[in-house]
């Protein structure tokens, strides 16, 4: 029997994930959910295995019913909704994935990461499910590349990473993902 996957968020990232999942033979059903119900239904209508639903992710109780019978939830929502999605996934015992570590656990990103890697890591273990945060380009891909490089060197004390996601075009390009998140990233002080 194939997998049932909930994709929360039907923006650029969620749409891309849903379209890719639609091509996977081991995926039987995709639930596309968003605050913009029309966008969720439009995306679902363009796929073979999907259904579209409304979901206000600021209310964890609206996420939980969508998780019924799911094997995985892919959180492609703005970072502020991450805590609700993680808590709903833990409650429903559904595997969790996101593209960037969510907000809402602590007042700084660093404290949030310590809490996710500590307390929430234990919660995922206790629930018997997997929680994978930061699987986008940064964090995510660059961390995998850095880790893979470690096998080729004798020792390493520090790895510094710098991310620049330049977009070259002859005409104005709107933000390539969430303008709110992009502006928040630009406003952050270096760590």
Question: Which residues fall in each region the model found?
Answer:
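Hydrophobic/small residue at the entry helix of a nucleotide-binding pocket
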Residues: 13
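Active-site-lining helix/loop region of Rossmann-like oxidoreductase modules
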Residues: 8, 151-191
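N-terminal Rossmann-like NAD(P) cofactor-binding module of classical short-chain dehydrogenase/reductase
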Residues: 67, 71-76, 96-98
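Rossmann-fold NAD(P)-binding glycine/threonine-rich loop
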Residues: 100-129
